[in-house]
């Protein structure tokens, strides 16, 4: 009798755990709004409430076969930083996001490697950044957009495969496995880029501050299988701007632990390097 009770308790505990895991892994439901060919948008509730704002995740889904991607950088265009709407309006882009974090000592330079065709914004790989956004393929047999995992793919083997690169910190590796960040208690507004096993590209923005590890868990709860994700920017610099015939959407961050602990930012900041998207 005692054995049966122990067995029953163990069974129920295991069933509860499996049910909880299943719910966590598919807890985000997304309904896409088509903005233009190959570009979709959705605002969804994050699985966890934030300390500030609406706890929403703003997600752009992109079919890379139907759009063109561009790196636009101040170092290539008049040495002048611009807001996301200014970048979009000047260069005719439907979507603009940060291309990565910039170097605080060289404010026009990406912190990691960045190249756009013959223009090198930063020619040096950042040692601890294991992710690389790549697009504008040199060979038509290559995918139009990739997130390369430099911990699994040697840089020398892929550095001439594409014409446009931007290096950043990995959040999920090429096998879909989460990475743990050491800054466990740092909260910030956040922008990141992800790709799924079908090749769709996702830009994910949150005005509400979360830790990096919380955001990684949110990515794993998406209803698509992510095979790579990179952190792009946080705080008031984090920018997402969408301007299509059907809709205009403006998203900018605010909160960063210790350096900007408020939700008061009410405008886009000027940023030096962006990724632009326009329909072919």
Where are these regions (language model features)?
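Bacterial Sec-dependent N-terminal signal peptides
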Residues: 1-25
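Generic cytosolic/nucleocytoplasmic N-terminal low-complexity/intrinsically disordered segments
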Residues: 3-4, 18, 33, 47-48, ...
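Solvent-exposed coil/turn segments that connect beta secondary-structure elements
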Residues: 65, 101, 198, 278-280
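Zymogen propeptides
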Residues: 23-126, 204
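Short, glycine/serine-rich, charged loops/turns that create anion-binding
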Residues: 13, 100-101, 208
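Active-site beta-strand/loop microenvironment that shapes enzyme catalytic pockets
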Residues: 91, 117-278
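Generic structural signal for short, solvent-exposed loop/turn connectors between secondary structure elements
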Residues: 16, 21-23, 92, 107, ...
């Amino acid at each position: 009798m005692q054995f049966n009770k122990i067995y029953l308790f163990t069974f129920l505990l295991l069933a509860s755990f499996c049910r909880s895991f299943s719910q966590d892994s598919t807890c985000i439901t997304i309904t896409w709004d088509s903005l233009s060919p190959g570009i979709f948008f959705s605002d969804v509730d994050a699985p966890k409430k934030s300390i500030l704002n609406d706890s929403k995740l703003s997600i752009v889904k992109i079919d890379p076969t139907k759009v063109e991607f561009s790196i636009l950088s101040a170092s290539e265009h008049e040495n002048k930083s611009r807001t996301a709407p200014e970048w979009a309006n000047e260069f005719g882009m439907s979507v603009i996001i940060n291309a990565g974090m910039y170097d605080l000592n060289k404010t026009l330079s990406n912190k990691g490697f960045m190249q756009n065709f013959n223009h090198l914004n930063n020619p040096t790989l950042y040692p601890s950044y294991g992710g690389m956004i790549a697009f504008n393929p040199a060979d038509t047999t290559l995918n139009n957009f990739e997130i390369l995992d430099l911990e699994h793919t040697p840089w020398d083997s892929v550095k001439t495969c594409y014409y446009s690169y931007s290096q950043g910190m990995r959040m999920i590796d090429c096998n879909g496995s989460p990475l743990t960040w050491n800054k466990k208690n740092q909260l910030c507004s956040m922008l990141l880029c992800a790709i799924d096993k079908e090749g769709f590209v996702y830009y994910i923005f949150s005005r509400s501050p979360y830790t990096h590890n919380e955001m990684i868990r949110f990515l794993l709860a998406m209803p698509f299988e992510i095979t790579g994700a990179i952190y792009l920017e946080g705080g008031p610099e984090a920018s997402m701007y969408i301007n299509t015939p059907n809709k205009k959407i403006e998203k900018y961050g605010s909160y960063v632990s210790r350096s900007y602990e408020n939700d008061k930012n009410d405008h886009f900041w000027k940023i030096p390097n962006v990724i632009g998207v326009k329909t072919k």
